[in-house]
């Protein structure tokens, strides 16, 4: 016989960004709890609103499955004393299992007999097991938590109610000083407290009080309502996924509506309007059929359509205040001088341990010039890089960016163009922030990419130099994101800039404002980001082998990892890698600076390998280079089959080791083959 279980936790208003992850976490923790406690079920589903987290288990068994476990104890010779009686070791073993020596039996394992006991545990009633549901709720973790009243505990928000129903039967439990019942709260303004009749009636009972418990249903309602407005008004609406996910977790009963604003505000840059609506007011942007921004917006009310016109007017009034600010800053910022703003950056702190923004820009300018050479930019591009690096942070002191910090770089580009800066310079000012997320947009221009690299490199090196190094999940200055951006830009543009040599060169630079330190840690940090970018689809041993190669060119590292991963599926992979691994291991015994002497070769297999090594010039794609190396496998095998490398003759031994070392030198640019696993 099965029943349905409902658990609802009523809370004060949750931050929108934690609602969905918390629902998912509750479902996962409940599933783990039921599995660990041997309670089977048919399905499990989550519910969430800004004021509740809930989980419903369908078809829950009314009793645990019985448990039968075998336990292996000491060997028979230890379990029995000289008189054939059970020893203290045997007695202690069974006592620890809650059994007696009468339960002991002996079983043979690999030719020797051992003590075994079998323990049977009858399944408990589901109601008894579910008494531990508060432990499931207590196990949830949140990015923030709070204390309330005089309680000693903390949680994401104060708890107001707890419901635990098994079909229609309430289980009496306590969590954070709240006793369970069947009362849930309806909509804050439209609904009332309501009694949940049963686990099955949960959604219907809440719906009667203007609460849509299913986040998926709220999302579908919002989309359908927006699409209906689109059709009626003949407009297009940008349904941004992130905004949609935020809005659906701000409301319990969604009603979408369209508002408007004075078309005069369309003269403000579109990015300002979109930021005001989307980021600050959580409004959806409206466009005409040609994609042009319209003086309208769509918002979602937490309630029904009653008095909707008043709600629309209120939202329009709030937005106009934002747009007035935007219009003012747009007008006033154009009166400012870029050079004056840049000069003032000397008084803006980049970080108290690192110095000013102006000092950061000075270092970035030097790095950018160096990178422009390394990346092979034209003279015109180098000139654009130099000018962009000289001014690229000026918009931080504009009124617009002060009010809308999301527009850093974007407004810099616009103001730069208005003052006559070259398009390449203006674009680089915007692009230097890219990518601004793990999968975010990359710079499109070489000038912008070089400036972005330089800015991120100085940021990384500066923070490391003053000891502000990320540890664990703690990364307050987003250095992992910056480094991931460095790796992605290098890969995207295919620039063959050896990172180890680049970092060496940067550490040789001299600045009055800062001395770069912790070089080894920086390189390890960059390696970790390259490893992450390779992805878990690439086997760990391949990632490690490639990262241990002698060539640290990011695009090539990524390509070689993919080539090796593909090759690992071929029959030729194992023998080739094993041959090369043997070469690597022996080559470690080679004496430095020993020249290969052909007159010391004693057989044709040595000569054949020497000829192959001498003529080996890796070229082409990573896949083609790997094929060149793997093609040496038969020659290497013949050499080992017919040649004693570690011969007693020291001169011949050193010569053979030198030959192997030369081979390693040529192929280790691909990977450290001795780190590859062929088992």
UniProtKB/Swiss-Prot annotation:
Catalysed transformations (reactions): tRNA(Gly) + glycine + ATP = glycyl-tRNA(Gly) + AMP + diphosphate
Lineage per the UniProt record: Bacteria, Bacillati, Bacillota, Bacilli, Lactobacillales
Enzyme class: ligase
Subunit structure as annotated in this protein's UniProt entry: Tetramer of two alpha and two beta subunits.
Biological processes per GO annotation: glycyl-tRNA aminoacylation
Protein's recorded name: Glycine--tRNA ligase beta subunit
GO cellular component terms, semicolon-separated: cytosol
InterPro entries assigned to the protein according to its UniProt record, in alphabetical order: Gly-tRNA-synth_bsu, Gly-tRNA-synth_heterodimer
Intracellular or extracellular location(s): Cytoplasm
Coarse class of the protein's main subcellular location: cytoplasm
E.C. no: 6.1.1.14
